[in-house]
């Protein structure tokens, strides 16, 4: 199970797509994009746990969080939760990259996530 904080322009009835599926953005650039909010990417960021997506949402008021069912999900997954996998995309000791990926248990998806694999997550108290 993966979790995602939806962008304001996303609607799960249409499935999920990256901001620019044809982008040449690298995994490293995508993870470090906080320095460039205009960066369009071919990756869909997800978190590997509910706790991680709650940390990711920070102070965002009224967040919309979804669950993504991984079974038979027709996308490429780039799981950055382990150091071994992170080192494939960042060979130096870039603390920001590694810290972000670990803190938010990042799993990047490449491709279209069909609406059949996405479900709203709205437990009581989450949106307070």
Segments and roles (model prediction):
Residues 1-128:
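NAD-dependent ADP-ribosyltransferases
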């Amino acid at each position: 199970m993966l979790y995602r904080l939806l962008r304001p322009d996303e609607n799960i009835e249409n499935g999920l797509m990256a901001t620019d599926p044809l982008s040449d953005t690298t995994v490293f650039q995508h993870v470090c994009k906080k320095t460039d909010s205009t960066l369009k990417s071919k990756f869909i960021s997800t978190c590997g746990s509910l706790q991680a997506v709650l940390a990711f949402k920070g102070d965002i008021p009224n967040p919309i969080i979804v669950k993504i069912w991984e079974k038979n999900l027709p996308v490429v997954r780039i799981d950055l939760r382990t150091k071994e996998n992170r080192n494939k995309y960042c060979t130096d000791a870039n603390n920001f990259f590694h810290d972000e990926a670990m803190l938010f248990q990042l799993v990047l998806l490449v491709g279209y996530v069909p609406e059949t694999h996405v479900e709203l997550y709205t437990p009581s108290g989450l949106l307070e």
